[in-house]
Every structure is written in C-alpha cells, then in structure tokens.
Design a protein with these regions (language model features):
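Alpha-helical scaffold elements lining the catalytic groove of polysaccharide deacetylases
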Residues: 56, 87, 136-162, 166, ...
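N-terminal pre-catalytic segment of deacetylase/amide-hydrolase enzymes
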Residues: 1-77, 84-98, 239-243, 247-276
Length: 276
C-alpha cells in the first residue's frame, strides 16, 4: 500500500498560519522593546540590565554625536542609582585619589533625599546625568509618563546641582527602552546613553571578579556600567584604573567621550587586549 500523506483541512492550515503570525509578532515586540533575553530580578533591590546593551545615542536634530576624530583610547566610568550615604562617599574619595572623572546617573528621588551628596558629586568634577525620577521600567509606561520621568528627574538634579555645561544625558533604568522612549528623550533634548560593558556589579560579585570581567572585555571607546552603592566596585577601581592607564586609556566623562568620538565608534567599539 502506498504511503499516505496527511493533507490537513483548510481550517487547520489557517490556524497554523495565524499561530506563526502571533509568534513572529511576539518576537518582534520583544526585540523592539529590548525585553528578550535575561532581564529577571536578581537578589536584592537591583534589577538586571539588558545583557547585550550597547551605547545607543538619541539624535539631537539630525546628528547623534559630533564626528571629531578621537585621539587615543578613552574610557568613561558610569555609576547608576543613588546617591547612597555609606558607599557613595567612599566612591568619591577613591575617584579623587585616582584622579578619575566619572558620570553619575542619579535617581531624582534619591538625589532629593541626599542633596549634600549630590552636590559633592558635582563639586568633585564629575558629570551628573538623569536616571529618571523614580527608576521605573520605562518600556511599560505611556509616552507621557516617560516624558514626565525624564523631565522631573532632570528638574530635581538641576535644582540641587545646576550643570553649567547644560548637557542632558539620560540612561533608562535597567537599560529597558522602546523606540517611543528614545523619541521622548530626543524631544526633551536628551542623549540616551547605554554602555559597552556590564560587569554585573548589580549582583553580589567580588571585587576580583568585577576587575577580571572589565579587563577581559575592554573595547575602545569604552563606557562601563557600574553602580554607586556597591563596595566591591569601589574596591576594584584602583587596579582597573591602573591597568587601563597602562594600556594607554584616558578616563573621561560621557559628555567628553561624546564630543571626541563618532557615532560609529561608539556603537561599534574596537576590542582591545590589555597587557598584564
């Protein structure tokens, strides 16, 4: 008897097609909102940033950033959240001892709670940037709510520590954003900043593990995602700074990095092998 080939009725073929359409739509939504991949809540109060985030810069007008050619390797250390009354002063002292400027993406409500610490960050020559007012997942908010978080967060920081440079940098909490998020930031005059390396200090990692990760994943130019409430991060900084300097890097703020790097360099950083 010849083999029988099952030919599904028309309604089954239609259902299969519709299922495929739904699956494709779900996948597209995940990529569009940057929510596909590991983004679960780790132990503690921190939330995991997106695993494969890269510096994404929302345009002002028709440009992302200036296109001046870079001179040498540059690295920007960025610290999210806070400020915090115990660890942030230790972090500021360490950065002062190392003569390293950094960019702090502060939460507006936390800055209001600790205004003296916020002013100390600015007085130390560091760049203060917007990390929203209350640290929500922006990809779950309406366009109006996103704009409000950016506007109110920036206003809180400006009241406490006015920025003479008037540069407006913004990082979405947990790295979660949609196209609408970027448009809202652009409309408000913000450059949206992610990172080239996330060593995972939002988890309970040791200083040695953090150091090893940063050194193994070096690129140029470099934007490193760190957090201002982690003692392991503070402990890892002296050796990290020393190794990068020996490899020819200059430590700058994100604002300085944007002024000296092209959009192509920022979104496609070159891998660098650091010497021992």
């Amino acid at each position: 008897m010849p083999a029988r080939i099952w030919n599904p009725p028309g309604h089954w073929r239609l259902l299969a097609f519709l299922l495929l359409v739904v699956l494709v739509a779900i996948a597209f939504q995940g990529f569009a909102t940057h929510t596909i991949g590991p983004s679960s809540e780790p132990a503690g109060s921190a939330t995991a940033p997106l695993a494969n985030a890269r510096p994404i810069l929302a345009a002002r007008g028709s440009k992302l950033v200036s296109v001046q050619p870079p001179a040498g390797r540059r690295i920007a250390l960025t610290f999210d959240d806070g400020p915090y009354p115990v660890v942030t002063p230790l972090l500021l002292q360490t950065l002062r001892d190392l003569r390293v400027p950094a960019t702090f993406f502060l939460i507006g409500r936390d800055a209001e709670q600790y205004p003296d610490l916020t002013r100390a960050i600015a007085a130390g020559g560091h760049e203060i940037a917007d990390h929203t007012l209350t640290h929500p997942d922006l990809d779950r908010l309406s366009d109006a709510a996103v704009a409000g978080e950016l506007r109110d967060g920036a206003a809180s920081l400006e009241r406490i520590a006015p920025d003479p440079a008037e540069r407006r940098l913004f990082r979405p909490p947990h790295g979660r954003f949609t196209v609408a998020t970027l448009r809202a930031a652009q409309s408000a005059g913000f450059d949206t900043i992610l990172w080239s390396d996330d060593p995972g200090d939002w988890r309970d990692v040791t200083a040695d593990a953090l150091r090893d990760h940063v050194l193994a994943h070096a690129v140029a130019p470099e934007i490193v995602l760190l957090h201002s409430g982690r003692q392991a991060t503070v402990a890892a900084l002296p050796e990290v700074v020393d190794r990068f300097r020996r490899a020819g890097y200059t430590f700058v703020t994100v604002g300085a990095l944007l002024r000296r790097s092209s959009a192509e360099q920022l979104n496609r950083p070159a891998k660098v092998a650091l010497g021992g």
